[in-house]
């Protein structure tokens, strides 16, 4: 009691708010007029521009900056690398080159250095091997949470646009 059931459950809640709610048209319908109150120079037509901006699909080097679609490819790269490390078919010395090649193959972009590449996450340094598939599981759970909310309360777009967050 008072604790989350798992890491994936905790992250699913975060992904629900970040991706399903925060990137939704209904949320931006609610938020934009409030943004205009704080920044009157925002034109009415800019709501759509902001909405499109937060939903733009564009490969990035850093997983935490990835859009909803390419985020999954970041997880797949990490899963494949971890699997090969654990199996012993990939050495630590080979990691940077394999990482760069997978980014080139999967995302069409290449890290310029290890900071943008294999060293960008703290999970391995903290001893969390096999951790990254939990991020994918959490995305699936967030989608299930959203579906359950809609079954119970109606379309999320309408609820969010009306500011019904409780």
Model-identified regions with their sequence ranges:
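C-terminal, non-catalytic "cap/extension" segments appended to globular domains
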Residues: 75, 79-166
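A conserved active-site cap/scaffold subdomain adjacent to cofactor or substrate pockets
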Residues: 2-90
